[in-house]
Amino acid sequence: MSGPVPSRARVYTDVNTHRPREYWDYESHVVEWGNQDDYQLVRKLGRGKYSEVFEAINITNNEKVVVKILKPVKKKKIKREIKILENLRGGPNIITLADIVKDPVSRTPALVFEHVNNTDFKQLYQTLTDYDIRFYMYEILKALDYCHSMGIMHRDVKPHNVMIDHEHRKLRLIDWGLAEFYHPGQEYNVRVASRYFKGPELLVDYQMYDYSLDMWRLGCMLASMIFRKEPFFHGRDNYDQLVRIAKFLGTEDLYGYIDKYNIELDPRFNDILGRHSRKRWERFVHSENQHLVSPEALDFLDKLLRYDHQSRLTAREAMEHPYFYTVVKDQARMGSSSMPGGSTPVSSANVMSGISSVPTPSPLGPLAGSPVIAAANPLGMPVPAATGAQQ
């Protein structure tokens, strides 16, 4: 085979080409470090593959913040996340990076963020109305169109990374640790992000993907919300994940996608893929979710969950879909007064998904007290974990 057919993003293709090198050359970025003594850890909120997350207090102004202490990874990965967060600072519904600090002894870096009052998505999604889902999907699209316009792919859009303060109807897209700058023609790592939200391009090892990867992931989120099926595509491994997708979207379009881009499919698929016809979205509608499903919702979903990344709606096109007409009309009427264009800090009690409300204990010492940053808490006490914390 002559190799895969190249692909370029349909929108914001040359954003980084037209920007100065220092905008996207994160490996050369010089980090400006803040003072770690400004922060006191309060409790542990959760942990992920690359970090541990704590609620903390900024003792200079007594405001709650979230401290993400990074586990040992390549320095360039840390610089990439910092550079992207700095480039996107102030963008609509983008989590605000407030400070960057480092323990002077262990040299472990930590990112300090605004605090968001989040409700565990597994609880929240069960209570959302049809309008709520439209509203929050539109808010996510604001963040995605903005980051795409800035030449950045998030690459890890999923419920765990969407913080929703439902009381104030505020949303933040968090965890930019896997985000990357888009350069046309560049080949990217396909071993990124959570299995249930992986786009077909990742599952068939097509490396010249672009912003449209985020739109597939958004489609998976929408499907899980309107059908109340979480996750929507539930594969046992990466191979089974594509099989689950093919059983619904059909194998004919999958092979059409593979042929179009001259993709060589892993031989392991020969025995497990089979032949499947395309199914109708309506088959997932039942008495418990029918109030969330509408013709425009299914049409919108159908335009996101496409094998061919080139044929998916862009974030801007998605915002113009009839599914959002009522939301757009309401926001226009209100002058977007309740829909902040920037990332205004949100007062909060918890930030990570899956965190139960617990009484906030007294601050337990400076950032150096983290079990990641230093061996022991200065007060000789462990930092308490929030119950049910997860990432």
UniProtKB/Swiss-Prot annotation:
List the InterPro entries: CK2_alpha, Kinase-like_dom_sf, Prot_kinase_dom, Protein_kinase_ATP_BS, Ser/Thr_kinase_AS
Q: Which reaction does it catalyse?
A: L-seryl-[protein] + ATP = O-phospho-L-seryl-[protein] + ADP + H(+); L-threonyl-[protein] + ATP = O-phospho-L-threonyl-[protein] + ADP + H(+)
Q: Which domain of life is it from?
A: Eukaryota
Report keywords, A-Z.
Answer: ATP-binding, Kinase, Nucleotide-binding, Proto-oncogene, Serine/threonine-protein kinase, Transferase
**SMART domains in alphabetical order:** S_TKc
From the Swiss-Prot or TrEMBL record, give the protein name: Casein kinase II subunit alpha 3
Q: The Protein kinase domain covers which part of the protein?
A: 39-324
* Similarity remark: Belongs to the protein kinase superfamily. Ser/Thr protein kinase family. CK2 subfamily.
Q: Where is the active site?
A: D156
Q: What would be an example GO MF term here? A: protein serine/threonine kinase activity
Q: What function is annotated for this protein?
A: Probable catalytic subunit of a constitutively active serine/threonine-protein kinase complex that phosphorylates a large number of substrates containing acidic residues C-terminal to the phosphorylated serine or threonine. Amplification-dependent oncogene; promotes cell proliferation and tumorigenesis by down-regulating expression of the tumor suppressor protein, PML. May play a role in the pathogenesis of the lung cancer development and progression.
- Tagged with keyword Transmembrane: no
Question: Subunit composition?
Answer: Heterotetramer composed of two catalytic subunits (alpha chain and/or alpha' chain) and two regulatory subunits (beta chains). Interacts with PML.
Q: What is its EC number?
A: 2.7.11.1
One of the GO biological process terms: positive regulation of cell growth
Please name the Gene3D superfamilies in this protein's record. Phosphorylase Kinase, domain 1, Transferase(Phosphotransferase) domain 1
Q: In which tissues is it expressed?
A: Detected in blood platelets and megakaryocyte cell lines. Poorly expressed in lung. Highly expressed in lung tumor tissues.
The coding gene here is CSNK2A3
Q: Which residues are involved in binding ATP? A: L45, G46, R47, G48, K49, Y50, S51, E52, V53, K68
Reported impact of I133T:
In a lung carcinoma sample; somatic mutation; shows greater kinase activity, provides a cell growth advantage and increases its interaction with the PML tumor suppressor protein and PML degradation
Question: Cellular component terms, GO, for this chain's entry?
Answer: cytosol; nucleoplasm; nucleus; protein kinase CK2 complex
- Species assigned in the record: Homo sapiens (Human)
